[in-house]
From Swiss-Prot:
It comes from Neorickettsia sennetsu (strain ATCC VR-367 / Miyayama). NCBIfam families: thrS (TIGR00418). Its EC number is 6.1.1.3. Homodimer. Binds 1 zinc ion per subunit. Belongs to the class-II aminoacyl-tRNA synthetase family. This is Threonine--tRNA ligase. Its cofactor is Zn(2+). The gene is thrS. Signal peptide: none annotated.
């Protein structure tokens, strides 16, 4: 087939050229400086290697190395180079998958070698060696039979399984670098020499494709960056995040613990439960002032309720099922069907709507043991759950009211940066287009009226309705999706919830699923790390520690402790015979915001020496002044 003349658009310039030229050569001829920074390219919206040959009119956008897309490609390259390094060091190793993840990558390996962090130096040295070899990274498309035959001969059973999962109409592509060959869609950099700044981070176990019934593999995580500064900044971030790990802080502050006999469930200690209750009561009071009615529903239900709601067929694998002589039951994984049952206990008129039912409901989900992580991923959890039953016309006003409530809560809890995402109708959905149109218009209108700036997640709505997601940005600039509001036309109809409209006809209400925190456990984990355990005074489990310099002032110190407690301040005492510098260090480590230090001088002058967390300075104040300072701060959020 002869060459044809193509029209190409590159960086707002259009020109003609012959087909068959590589994308890289086109960019190089156009601007050599830009080409030197380009790792791959987008051709008509599809990311390709620079070796890709043009065969049709094209809009070309260079993917620069330091761009978000460029760094993602670099990390994918590093995953391949790491896999090559591991196989060169340990030839018996077989390969699983090696995708890019947030800020890094991983690769799963099947090997008799038990990897540990101590192996990283050797693997990293081999990676640097492969980078120095500067292998060209070459893409080839193989027939399905050839690909299967090749990987079968190498004993790469996981690659063979991956090929079997590729749709028949999709091409099978592989990438070569030296003698190393891997199954991959790409794109990749032109050569391994593009990699310079990387670090292996940790190793863990993982099931093949996340299936607990499949093989157990070893997963090595790493990160790669376009610049040395980028890598160093990220490693510094990881160091700070490790210091803030809620599991370590939880142990230091005696907040909670976890143990094997109750996997994924939390043992709250006194300090942790105080923190939990303070947060719960704060949310409870907010809900009360915003017109919510608190309910409490059972923990265990017969499967017939879940069959009617649709959860039994779609969610059973994630439910804890109990079998008895009376049939099959389940611990509830969510509260929504139970709230509909509460709603149905009396006849409702349109005048009774909106009805807002809230519950701090204990739920259980059978999460894979490998997915459990401290408070962030548990099996037993409490949701700050509420469901608003309303008419279609009330969706907008209820959404505005909820957004206002959510902003108040996040502000009070110290989160000033919140991202909002709007997810509209997915391809597979229930309900007709007219109903979806009304719901999406109502939600968008509400967000506009509430002054929310949001991004669109096309097609990411729930199958039963569109949704809004609220993403918190913490002190380390990490993002946590916590709040949500979801419109549901389906469940009220499935469970036959109705109201009488103004024409006397039965209608099904719209159900708004909404949460602010998500789950208490996860949100408390986020809070601990956000504040590094150094909570604002109103949240702190212990607000004041009264420390004595000498046992001779113990009676005076006890009277101060009693005074604090009567005022409603959470205070503890330390009258031990330890040195005062030890006491100060101990209670500072436990993140107590305020220390009252008591000696003979303070006793004689009816005063206290006040030391605030984070300060090496102390200040002598009268008891009334010191107490007044606490009360003023305590009442400010």
């Amino acid at each position: 087939m002869g060459r044809v003349v193509l029209t190409v658009t590159l960086l707002s310039s259009s020109f003609s050229l012959s087909s068959g030229k590589t994308v890289g050569s086109v960019i190089s001829d156009f601007d050599a400086e830009i080409f030197s920074k380009t790792i791959a390219a987008s051709v008509n919206g599809v990311s390709v290697d620079l070796s890709y040959r043009l065969d049709c009119d094209a809009n070309i956008e260079p993917i620069l190395l330091e761009s978000e897309a460029g760094i993602e490609i670099l990390r994918h390259d590093c995953a391949h180079v790491m896999a090559q390094a591991v196989q060169e060091l340990y030839p018996e190793t077989k390969l699983g998958i090696g995708p890019v993840i947030d800020d890094g990558f991983y690769y799963d390996f099947s090997t008799p070698i038990a990897f540990s962090d101590s192996d990283f130096e050797k693997i990293e040295e081999k990676i640097r060696e492969i980078i120095q070899r500067n292998y060209r990274i070459i893409r080839e498309e193989w027939s399905r039979d050839d690909a299967v035959s090749f990987f079968q001969k190498k004993g790469e059973k996981y690659k063979v399984e991956l090929i079997s999962r590729i749709p028949p109409e999709e091409k099978i592509s592989i990438y070569k670098q030296g003698d190393f060959i891997d199954l991959c869609r790409g794109p990749h950099a032109p050569s391994t020499g593009w990699l310079k700044h990387f670090k292996l981070l940790k190793v863990s176990t993982a099931y093949w494709l996340g299936d607990a019934k499949s093989d157990s593999l070893q997963r090595i995580y790493g990160t790669a960056w376009a610049t040395k500064d980028g890598l160093e900044a990220y490693l510094s971030f990881l160091h700070e995040a490790k210091k803030r790990d809620h599991r370590a802080i939880g142990k230091t502050m005696e907040l909670f613990h976890l143990q094997e006999e109750a996997q994924g469930q939390v043992f709250w200690h006194e300090n942790g439960f105080i923190l939990y209750r303070v947060l719960e009561n704060y949310i409870r009071n907010k809900l009360k002032t915003h017109g919510y009615r608190e309910v409490k529903t059972p923990l265990v239900y017969n499967k017939c309720l879940w069959e009617r709601s649709g959860h039994w067929s779609k969610f059973k694998e994630n439910m804890f099922v109990i079998r008895s002589d009376d049939g099959e039951f389940s611990l509830k994984p969510m509260n929504c069907p139970a709230h509909i049952e509460v709603y149905k206990q009396s006849l409702k008129s349109y005048r009774d709507l909106p009805l807002r039912l809230a519950e701090f409901g204990m739920c259980h989900r059978n999460e894979a043991s490998g997915a459990l992580h401290g408070l962030m991923r548990v099996r037993g959890f409490v949701q700050d759950d509420a469901h608003i039953f309303c008419t279609p016309q009330q969706i907008c006003d209820e959404t505005i009211a909820f957004c206002g409530l959510l902003k108040e809560v996040y502000r009070d809890l110290g989160f000033t940066e919140v991202e909002v995402r709007f997810s509209d109708r997915p391809e597979v959905r229930l309900g007709n287009d007219e109903t979806w149109d009304k719901a999406e218009i109502a939600l968008k209108s509400a967000m506009d009226k509430a002054g929310l700036i949001y991004t669109l997640n096309p097609g990411e709505g729930a199958f039963y309705g569109p949704k809004i997601e609220f993403v918190l940005v913490d002190a380390l600039k990490r993002k946590w999706q916590c709040g949500t509001l979801q419109v549901d036309f389906v469940l009220p109809e499935r469970l036959d919830a109705t109201y009488i409209d103004h024409e006397g006809k039965k209608q099904h209400p719209v159900m708004l699923h909404r949460a602010i925190l998500g789950t208490f456990e996860r949100f408390l984990g986020i809070l601990i790390e956000h504040y590094d355990g150094k909570f604002p005074l109103w949240l702190a489990p212990t607000q004041v520690a009264v420390l004595t310099i000498t046992e001779k002032v113990e009676e005076y110190a006890k009277s101060l402790l009693n005074h604090l407690s009567k005022t409603g301040i959470r205070a503890v005492s330390d009258f031990s015979n330890q040195r005062i510098d030890y006491k100060i260090r101990y209670h500072t480590t436990r993140r107590v915001p305020i220390l009252w230090i008591i000696g003979r001088i303070e006793e004689k002058s009816n005063s206290v020496t006040v030391r605030r967390m984070g300060s090496s300075e102390s200040e002598v104040k009268t008891v009334d002044t010191a107490l007044g300072d606490i009360l003023r701060e305590f009442n400010v959020r």
